[in-house]
Every structure is written in C-alpha cells, then in structure tokens.
Amino acid sequence: MLRSFLRAKLHMATVTQADINYEGSITIDSDLLKKTGILPFEKVSVSNVNNGERFDTYVIPGKKGQICLNGPTARKGVVGDRVVIFSYCYISENEAAGFKPVILKLDEKNRVKEQIKK
C-alpha cells in the first residue's frame, strides 16, 4: 500500500508578487526548487499564514527570492503575506521507515534561514 507523505516544505515564504492576469500557478525561486527537489509543473499545496487560505496549484520556476501568486491564486494573498508551500509524495510502508522530508525555513527575503532535519 502506498501512503501520502510530506516530501518538501518551504516554511514562511514571503509573497513578493501577485499577478491576477497570469494563467495560474505559483512562481517559486529556482534555487529553492533545486534545494527541495520540487520540479516545474509539480502540484503543491499552499497555506497562507496571514489569512488562512489554502489552495493547490502547480509550480513554475522564478528568479532569486521570487514567490508569485499567479492567476486565480492571486486572490488568495497579497504581497508581504507569509505562506507555507507543501510538496507530497506517495511511498510504500517499507520506504516510510527511513524517509525524511526536506524542510526549509525562509527569512522575509525568501533566503534559507535553516534546514530542518527530522
């Protein structure tokens, strides 16, 4: 049986832009994507700490420090809001025993402040 687990988390990212006219998605700093293993067009869940909104969307790579809510998701937050971005995976019970997610705590400029090892 496969189970759903947290694979990666960007904790307390700061929204730097909201573009209602874009087709959709969330733009995330390419360096952060590399560090977490999140791929372009991968589905992610996003939780807005400021207003409690939660939504699912897909990722597109962006510039250094960039976190942009695009299209309809631009209605889910404003510049300056803090968000948590989650990526999940399905793994077997055997794989789960030694599995560790990648968790990055970010500062207000979306730089890695700390990598949490669980």
Predicted regions and their residues:
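A cross-kingdom feature strongest in bacterial/archaeal respiratory oxidoreductases
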Residues: L2-S4, H11
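Short, glycine/charged-enriched hinge/interface segments at domain edges or termini
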Residues: V102-K118
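Compact, glycine-rich, soluble single-domain proteins
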Residues: F5, V15-T16, I20-A97, E108-R111
